[in-house]
Design a protein with these regions (language model features):
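Conserved strand-loop elements at the edges of beta-sheets that form or border functional pockets
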Residues: 10, 68, 180-181
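A short, hydrophobic C-terminal helix/tail in secreted or cell-surface proteins
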Residues: 215-219
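Asp-based phosphoryl-transfer active-site loop
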Residues: 6-19
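Active-site phosphate-binding/coordination module
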Residues: 25-124
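Residue-level recognition of oxygen-bearing side chains
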Residues: 22, 26, 194
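Conserved acidic, metal-coordinating active-site core of Asp-based
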Residues: 102-214
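A general structural motif
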Residues: 2-5, 38, 63, 104, ...
Length: 219
């Protein structure tokens, strides 16, 4: 039977992952069956590559395309990199060290295959139990901006993040793209980065799926 679509695109959190932040057996079964029928599987998420690889390897989808860090990077499940759009090193370092209230906000970065944070925040661990992907606590003033896919700020509430967003917009303007993944998480990427842009670029590069066939996320 010919399926009416050539590809499926899904996020992870709130979509493929269940309430325990794991991928369920039924979801694994459906994705595996679709892949065996020739449907291309795209995962587009704000998570980092090693985190996503561990989750998706449970599915029999050898050629899954993983769009990670909100579109800053795309790799086949095997690890082969197809695209990446890092923040400039100096800009990334400045973002990591922007002023904020450390009692209300923490700063994180995804850099290559690593996750860095300025404090140990145990509440984040539940989201990564399945993959085991874990942060490293660093002093960002002594850190570096190499291979930065995104810098993100987690606040106790939205009001804690609004001054940071305003400062970033006023200082860096169109050099960066900002988005709230949740009301408590402000994410900052290169100005060309979004899931939609990454998927469009992949469609043009790979050619197996026409851009017109893709229903694209907006972040």
């Amino acid at each position: 039977m010919t399926l009416p679509f050539k590809a499926i695109i899904s996020d992870l959190d709130g979509t493929l992952l269940n309430a325990e932040h794991k991928i369920g057996d039924f979801t694994i079964k459906i994705l595996s069956e679709l892949s065996q029928k020739g449907v291309d599987v795209y995962i587009a998420t704000g998570r980092n590559l090693p985190d996503v690889q561990h989750i998706i390897r449970k599915v029999n989808v050898d050629e899954a395309m993983l769009v990670t860090s909100n579109g800053a990077r795309a790799n086949f499940l095997s690890g082969e990199c197809v695209l990446n759009h890092h923040l400039p090193e100096e800009l990334a370092f400045k973002l990591m060290n922007i002023e904020f209230d450390p009692t209300r906000v923490c700063v994180n970065s995804y850099q290559g295959d690593e996750w860095f944070i300025n404090i140990d925040l145990e509440s984040l661990r539940k989201y990564h139990k399945d993959s085991g992907f874990m942060y490293q606590v660093v002093d960002f003033a002594q850190h570096h901006g190499r291979q930065t896919e995104k810098v993100f700020f987690i606040g106790r509430e939205l009001a804690d993040l609004l001054p940071i967003e305003q400062k970033i917009r006023e200082t860096y303007g169109d050099q960066v793209y900002t988005v709230y993944s949740t009301p408590q998480c402000l994410e900052v990427m290169n100005n060309s980065v979004s899931k939609a842009n990454a998927l469009e670029e992949l469609a043009e590069r790979i050619g197996s799926v026409s851009y017109t066939h893709l229903t694209l996320p907006t972040t």
